[in-house]
UniProtKB/Swiss-Prot annotation:
Disulfide bonds join 67-111, 283-334, 508-525. Glycans are attached at residues 120, 164, 301. Keywords: Cytoplasmic vesicle, Disulfide bond, Glycoprotein, Glycosidase, Hydrolase, Lipid metabolism, Lysosome, Signal. This is Beta-hexosaminidase subunit beta. InterPro entries: Beta_hexosaminidase_sua/sub, Glyco_hydro_20_cat, Glycoside_hydrolase_SF, Hex-like_dom2, HEX_eukaryotic_N. GO terms for biological process: carbohydrate metabolic process; ganglioside catabolic process; glycosaminoglycan metabolic process; N-glycan processing; single fertilization. Belongs to the glycosyl hydrolase 20 family. It comes from Sus scrofa (Pig).
Length: 531
């Protein structure tokens, strides 16, 4: 990660002094989350007045007042800092002393349009009255710095908004820090997705993995194949219109979050078949049609003609460079029961008919995606140890059994990895299971340093069989926050007791901001008596 020019000496001094991410006394009391790389919080305090504080652009910033992303962020964070107490009749006073009147934001590059896997999210925060300074290479780093700045501010015993003089240098450990939501099993309203994106920004996640369709329903309203949702959705009101999709992408964009769509193939596709004739494989029982259908039919030209047109649409609707094409949990029995598929695969010389049918299908689709100047992501079943995928294909590891060995095999073959196996948040248990997620080390597997660097990051997955809008938010948060810190903070940030103290405060902060995050354990939030 590139660090801002002119700050390398300060960073080196912090590292030599071993102050980075280890002296957490101030961070613990404030609940900074995820913990920044380098934190130096002074006991000297500054006061803020809601009527006399504002965010502004540095005169030399290349992303100025015309940058909509920053202008929107200034409005959001002013409200996060002061708004709750306004609307809940909280009292605040301005005591004598130095007043912090402004946070100036300086961005080294012009206002970007969309974040990407290579976006620089580093920032430096210098808080000293009467003006604080936030410096970042990009607007995406500025957004992360604004979140940290908002976490520094608290109310003292007199109700005065207060911030301690601080120096913070920060950047993420991994570039891919995702949350997976599943709208194929249960439809989630756009409003619910917005709330998830808000919480993601509070925890510095930067990828919404949208598993948008599945066997049970097809809620994505295609521009070119509208019959897919009209026949495959739960109902005509359980669809995401093109405008809905645009709103989700835009809401995510101005928070520095990428939206990565997943359309799982060739399995998990029963809902597709309701609107696309001959797409699915007819299954047989004792050489007689059973009346059921299996995965996408891998031997018909019409299959690939349709998929090519469909994914061409997806590549234009979703601006992100990645498209997830699935490749997991394919019902091989149906393929093996179909004599036409058996004959086709035998003619191709495939010995493992079912496995090779899957690989053949996924390989063709991944080539389609690559031809569209996008990068495919697949689940680990699509990887068989051969370098058959296009360069740049990413493999997502989800099976908990031997997942470290799986990471080793994939990275040794030269492919990047996204880790999800230890972070399936839909698997709930009694107690503080967030600690299990927190203690995961994504690069702890047999391999060279070069191979470990192929880990792009990870995702916390919340599959939707038992999750809808009523329980999505409390099941995600603050359990996903543990994953967020593991993917953002330095690998040596592992003190579970310190994490508990900070996460307890951070959870209350999320609740104060409207996120129904469940409690970690017994206790209360300080803001409750004001409600």
């Amino acid at each position: 990660m590139e660090v801002l020019p002119g700050l390398l000496r300060l960073l080196a001094a912090l590292v030599v002094a071993e102050r980075w991410a280890r002296d957490t006394s101030g961070a613990e009391s404030l609940g900074l989350w995820p913990l920044p790389f380098a934190v130096d919080i002074s006991p000297r305090s500054l006061h803020l007045s809601p009527n006399n504080f504002f965010f502004g652009h540095s005169p030399t910033s290349k992303a100025g007042s015309s940058c909509e992303i920053l202008q929107e962020a200034f409005r959001r964070y002013y409200d996060f800092i002061f708004g709750f107490y306004k609307w809940h009749q909280g009292s605040y006073q301005l005591c004598f002393g130095t007043e912090l009147q402004q946070l100036q934001v300086h961005v080294e590059s012009e206002c970007d349009t969309f974040p990407s896997i290579s976006s620089n999210e580093s920032y430096v925060l210098h808080v000293k009255g009467p003006e604080a300074l936030l410096r970042a290479n990009t607007v995406w780093g500025a957004l992360r710095g604004l979140e940290t700045f908002s976490q520094l501010i608290y109310q003292d015993s007199y109700g005065t908004f207060t911030v301690n003089e601080s120096e913070i240098i920060d950047f993420p450990r991994f570039p891919h820090r995702g949350i997976l939501i599943d709208t194929g099993r249960h439809f989630l309203s756009v409003k619910t997705i917005f709330k998830t994106l808000d919480a993601m920004a509070f925890n510095k996640f930067n990828v919404l993995h949208w598993h948008i369709v599945d066997d049970q329903s097809f809620p994505y309203q295609s521009i070119n194949f509208g019959v897919l949702s009209s026949k495959g959705s739960y109902s005509l009101s359980h669809v995401y219109t093109p405008n809905d999709v645009r709103m989700v992408i835009e809401y995510a964009r101005i928070r520095g979050i990428r939206v990565m769509p997943e359309f799982d193939t060739p399995g998990h596709s029963r809902s597709w078949g309701k609107g696309q004739k001959d797409l699915l494989t007819p299954c047989y029982r004792k050489q007689v049609l059973s009346g059921t259908f299996g995965p996408i039919n891998p031997i018909l030209n019409t299959t690939y003609n349709f998929l090519s047109k469909f994914f061409k649409e997806i590549s234009t609707v979703f601006p992100d460079e990645f498209i997830h094409i699935g490749g997991d949990e394919v019902d091989f029995d149906c393929w093996a029961s179909n004599s036409e598929i058996l004959q086709f695969m035998q003619e191709k010389g495939f010995s493992q008919i079912s496995l090779n049918s899957n690989l053949c299908t996924v390989f063709k689709i991944s080539n389609m995606i690559s031809a569209m100047k996008k990068r495919p992501i697949v689940w680990q079943e699509a990887f068989d140890g051969r370098d058959k995928f296009m360069p740049g294909t990413v493999v997502q590891v989800w099976k908990i059994e031997d997942y470290k060995w799986e990471q080793s095999l994939i990275t040794k073959a030269g492919f990047p990895v996204i880790l999800s196996a230890p972070w399936y948040l839909d698997l709930i248990s009694y107690g503080q299971d967030w600690k299990n997620y927190y203690e995961v080390e994504p690069q702890d597997f047999p391999g060279s340093d070069k191979e470990r660097k192929r880990v792009l990051g990870g995702e916390a997955c919340l599959w939707g069989e038992y999750v809808d809008a009523t329980n999505l938010t409390p099941r995600l948060w603050p359990r996903a926050s543990a994953v967020g810190e593991r993917l953002w903070s330095h690998k040596d940030v592992r003190d579970i007791h310190d994490a508990y103290s900070r996460l307890t405060i951070h959870r209350c902060r999320m609740v104060r901001r409207g996120i129904a995050a469940e409690p970690l354990f017994t206790g209360y939030c300080n803001h409750e008596h004001r409600m």
